[in-house]
């Protein structure tokens, strides 16, 4: 489920059972891996955590809910953005406001693929300042933060 900052339900996401991934050549079916109900617009996942942020406390941005859960399990406050191309102007404004009002520095471990790197670069560009988001590098054997987290726990 997706909630707004006040905890009101604003949407849901489910796994597409028609999606099939092949480990050969990293190919996948044309069906998307995740689906949103018709008419739903994608937002930042886990917005209620923003009310818990203290001045100067970091916020971790992840690419997808499972990475967000792993980051939360690591003791960090985190949100997930499915894609920079789906990011709404009002969601981007929320992230920008955190930096200006709470001195929140955003942190990100981009997924080890082209879309993950593109999300980080797009966020850095959209936020307007390279210093508003800090990039962390995963070890080379891990595809994303949840993969890394699971290997340690």
Where are these regions (language model features)?
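A generic structural motif
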Residues: 132-143
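Active-site-adjacent alpha-helix of alpha/beta-hydrolase-fold enzymes
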Residues: 122-129
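Acidic beta-strand-to-loop metal/phosphate-binding motif
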Residues: 61, 104-115
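Switch/connector loops and helix/strand junctions flanking conserved nucleotide-binding motifs
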Residues: 116-118, 144-145
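Intrinsic disorder
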Residues: 22, 100-103, 131-132
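Short, acidic/turn-prone active-site loops that include or flank metal/cofactor-
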Residues: 82-87, 111-114, 138-140
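Phosphate-handling DNA/RNA-contact segment within nucleic-acid enzymes
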Residues: 1-99, 120
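Short, small/acidic-rich helices and loops at N termini and domain boundaries
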Residues: 146-153
